[in-house]
Design a protein with these regions (language model features):
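Long, low-complexity intrinsically disordered regions
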Residues: 1-297, 301-309, 316-320, 325-335, ...
Length: 445
């Protein structure tokens, strides 16, 4: 038996960056078309949603990171208008996925009665007739927001003064259960980020409606897992079993047979990568000799959302501190990793100060030995982000280094003075997902 091919950590980083679309040509600023957006969708396969809006809602950022400044309405159109290129479901976390991927998650829909959050399970157990009523309202009158469903129920069956047992919280719980269970879907969002619930025949393109409406049972799950692992493997380029499982939150026992089938078919190649016990390379993955990339990354970008992978490939310790008390935060509230070349070289705590029209950078923390060219690249990306968000670029503080310091931190002060510078679900992800279900008020109930 021949020895497995060895892939260095540096090669693995470059493979991952290329697979995620960071080396594809960028259009001119604000020149991106739906074709460019589709290219990113095809590359990553999943875009995580998050309701935090301190900078911009997270689902918009992966497209900026790969395309540069683009019209945000382009993504809204891909999600909200037929033929939809993106629909919502629980994929990695709450996510935007291609309509063709939605039926592959049927196994998760069937688990809703047992695995949905407690308040959703309770509404099904205690008020099954009410859940059916809410489903009928959506199917007959949708797409509808939660508040519109409430208004429709109020019109059809007005509540007496002593109430007859339902309220907005129950409507929302019923809708979220039905959404999780795949009994209804989403036709997009309002400008206030409220989900527009819809019958299952509304979101998919005509050629995919049958796959949505007539889903095979558990006997088709092995093929579903195969397709999901195939998407993850292509999007990662190279990865461990945990990487491939985490992309769609699959279990190891669901992933292993799929990996074996893909290896047997020649789509995956077993390789040795330092830091992973076992790893697989996608047969069509590019292995660039060098990488010229500059990108500020969403905390929920698919390049960095699996923290063990980030630590293994980049030796970069990254945690989201949104839900960390202020006095315990290390790097800031909304911190974006900065990709330069094939390395993650800095963390930037950013905020869109819409009242003053400024993109604020509260802090920059540089990795040890960050390259000397990184500060100028960061300044370029901050300027591009400010233009994208229709803000002025605000002052940037001198970066503070980690450990023994960095050439980048030493260089940063001079550059900015010229500009007038002044895998498994973590607790942080669960909190974010629960806040997302609450939509605009950040609460489920």
């Amino acid at each position: 038996m021949s020895a497995e091919r060895r892939v260095s950590r540096e090669q693995a980083r470059r493979i991952a960056i290329a697979a995620q679309g960071f080396l594809d040509p960028r259009p001119a600023p604000f020149g991106a078309t739906m074709r460019h957006l589709q290219r990113v969708i095809d590359r990553v396969g999943v875009v995580q949603i998050d309701s935090v809006n301190v900078l911009v809602r997270s689902q918009y950022l992966p497209f900026f990171s790969r395309l540069g400044p683009y019209d945000l309405a382009l993504l809204d159109r891909a999600r909200d208008r037929a033929p939809r290129r993106l629909v919502e479901y629980w994929a990695h976390e709450a996510s935007l996925i291609p309509p063709a991927t939605w039926p592959l998650l049927d196994f998760r829909m069937r688990e809703a009665a047992e695995k949905a959050w407690g308040s959703m399970r309770r509404i099904l157990a205690e008020r099954p007739e009410f859940v059916e009523l809410v489903q009928r309202e959506v199917e007959q009158r949708g797409p509808l927001t939660a508040s519109e469903v409430e208004q429709a129920l109020e019109h059809d069956q007005p509540r007496p003064t002593d109430h007859w047992g339902w309220n907005w919280s129950e409507v929302k719980r019923a809708l979220e259960f039905l959404f999780w269970a795949g009994r209804i879907s989403s036709a997009g969002r309002t400008a206030q980020f409220e989900r527009r619930y819809a019958a299952l025949d509304v979101p998919p393109p005509p050629d995919q409606r049958a796959a949505w409406l007539d889903r095979p049972g558990p006997e088709a799950d092995p093929d579903r897992f195969l397709e999901l692992v195939r998407i993850a493997a292509r999007a990662h380029g190279v990865g461990s079993e945990r990487c491939l499982a985490d992309y769609f939150r699959l279990k190891r026992e669901q992933v292993r047979p799929a990996i074996e089938r893909l290896v047997a078919d020649g789509e995956l190649i077993p390789v040795t990568v330092p830091g992973w016990r076992r790893a697989w390379l996608h047969a069509e993955a590019r292995i660039p000799r060098r990488v010229h990339a500059e990108a500020l990354l969403s905390p929920f970008d698919s390049l960095v959302w699996q923290r063990e992978r980030v630590h293994t490939l980049w030796d970069f310790h990254y945690r989201i501190e949104i839900y960390t008390p202020k006095h315990k935060r290390v790097h800031g509230y909304y911190v974006l990793p900065f990709l330069y070349g094939d390395r993650l070289v800095a963390r930037c705590d950013l905020k869109a100060d819409r009242q003053r029209g400024l993109l604020r950078c509260h802090a920059v923390t540089w990795e040890p030995d960050a390259p000397a060219g990184a500060p100028a690249a960061l300044r370029r990306q901050l300027d591009a982000m400010a233009a994208w968000l229709r803000l002025e670029p605000g002052p940037v503080p001198d970066g503070r280094p980690i450990g023994n310091g960095s050439r980048a931190a030493a260089e940063l002060s001079g550059i900015l003075d010229d500009r007038g510078a002044e895998g498994h679900r973590t607790a942080e992800q669960s909190q974010g997902a629960r806040a997302l279900v609450g939509e605009t008020d950040g609460r489920l109930a």
